[in-house]
Amino acid sequence: MSCWAKVTKFDPRSAALADRHYSRRKVGSPQFMPPGQTLILLSDGEAAVFGWWRPDPKSGIKAMNGLDGWTCTIFRNESLAYVSSAMILEAEQMLRAEGYDIGPDGFITYVWDKKVNSANPGYCFKLAGYKTRGRSADGKKTLLIKPYP
């Protein structure tokens, strides 16, 4: 049984968690995901949110980083009940279960090193199998990728 349930990008419980995430652009906004294909997951204890995003392949729009895969745009875990790396793996399973094409670049995320309180930024993603693949265009974030088999 998964710790996650699907919700929409307008889910107020998820938006409240997003308000406390370092990537939040506008605190209090009713939504927190970019346009395109999304899968938003809320933990069963409502203490964690995970958001997958990909430009809709039918739109012709490409991701600014040139990668073709699903990007975790937000992951906030305030839960003590679940290990973050296990939650990431379950979020990947949920995405596959939806039947989406994962894309040749697999699973993608960025971690803003200076905004996380960790000596090893992205550690939970690394435990879930992600590897460092460079930096964001502005140089502020570490790019982590996990190929999809």
Predicted regions, residues:
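Non-catalytic substrate-recognition and accessory regions of acyl/acetyltransferase enzymes
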Residues: 1-115, 119, 123-149
